[in-house]
């Protein structure tokens, strides 16, 4: 039998922990965090939400086997000037959004911050328009203020 190189004993916890720390660089999450890749490459800069100005409304075709034109908007972020595509959820949600409106976007909820479902290349969704939630606008609880 080959003897294990790991310490075994009542007081071995520190030694075992330090041994594990040597292999952390091979873990994807640790490497992303330590190299600050989220802040560098994420348009939102690691933040949960961002404010932006609507440049145009676009219809994006969904992937197979679905067939639909999903309503999206091109948004220029205020914080860094980057342009991203954001999905507008809900039935008739795009009717509440006009060009040059101020919107708040957040992640769409895909795995590892990527796109979700049948929307190719869309990582964000609109949650607020001119300071009013999109949900309140659908339900008729509030009206959209004019900027």
UniProtKB/Swiss-Prot annotation:
One of its GO terms (molecular function) is structural constituent of ribosome. CDD domains: Ribosomal_S23. One of its GO terms (cellular component) is cytosolic small ribosomal subunit. The keyword rRNA-binding applies. Pfam families: Ribosom_S12_S23 (PF00164). The keyword Ribonucleoprotein applies. It comes from the Archaea. InterPro entries: NA-bd_OB-fold (IPR012340), Ribosomal_uS12 (IPR006032), Ribosomal_uS12_arc (IPR022863), Ribosomal_uS12_euk/arc (IPR005680). GO terms for biological process: translation. Changing residue 2 to S: In strain: MT-4. Keywords: Ribonucleoprotein, Ribosomal protein, RNA-binding, rRNA-binding. Part of the 30S ribosomal subunit. With S4 and S5 plays an important role in translational accuracy. Located at the interface of the 30S and 50S subunits. Belongs to the universal ribosomal protein uS12 family. This is Small ribosomal subunit protein uS12. It comes from Saccharolobus solfataricus (strain ATCC 35092 / DSM 1617 / JCM 11322 / P2) (Sulfolobus solfataricus).
């Amino acid at each position: 039998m080959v003897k294990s190189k790991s310490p075994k004993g009542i007081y071995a916890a520190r030694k075992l922990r330090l041994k594990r720390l040597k292999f952390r660089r091979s873990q994807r999450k640790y490497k992303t965090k330590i190299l600050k890749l989220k802040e560098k490459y994420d348009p939102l800069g690691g933040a949960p939400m961002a404010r932006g100005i609507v440049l145009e409304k676009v219809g994006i075709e969904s992937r197979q086997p679905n067939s639909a034109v999903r309503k999206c908007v091109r948004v220029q972020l205020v914080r860094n000037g980057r342009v991203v595509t954001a999905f507008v959820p809900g039935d008739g949600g795009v009717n509440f959004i006009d060009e040059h409106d101020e919107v708040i976007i957040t992640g769409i909820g895909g795995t590892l911050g990527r796109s979700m479902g049948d929307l190719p290349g869309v990582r964000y969704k609109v949650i607020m328009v001119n300071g009013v939630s999109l949900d309140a606008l659908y339900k008729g609880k509030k009206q959209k203020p004019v900027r």
